[in-house]
Amino acid sequence: MTSSNGWWGNKFGAQFGLKCYKAFSVENLFLQAEFNAVRPYTYSHDELNLNFGHNNQPLAHLWGANFREAVGIMNYTKNRWFANAKVVIGKKGFDFADGTDTKSYGGDVFADNDDRVSDYGNTIGQGNVANVFIGDLQLGYLVNPATNLKLFGGLTYRKFEPAAPAKGFSASNSTWISFGLKTDVFNWYFDF
């Protein structure tokens, strides 16, 4: 780990974050900032049933391995009004899907470690590099506090830019406008 030679077996990830309640002395303002990075091949294994995945999903992080991401979250409430915002900016290394390069670049936890691209010189984001941006904004009104019934509207923007088409993915931009009525009748999560 300390030689910095990019050995494929140096499998680790890092997470740094900060949560702030009553940020800037503003009542009911919650801020969160987070940085995550995971080296290539971290959750994969040469015995496929020993990887860090289940039900065709990576367990440790949605992006698997071979990525860096920064996350910012803001929640604010004033009386019965609320606003939530979330921004995710990241870079992820995928395998190539053109059929000419069948090596694993370390991002797919279900790929065999023995198919790695190199023993040394592996870096986060190697392979088919994709830039990812996700922005989400939601505004709403708490209609009934007893049942947590909320009227809300939201805007979500996602941008995915791989250098080349990835397995099942190509470059895309999507924007969603949402609105609705929701309730958290069975919200029993109070670990904060």
Predicted features and spans:
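Exposed, low-structure sequence patches enriched in small/polar residues
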Residues: M1-F192
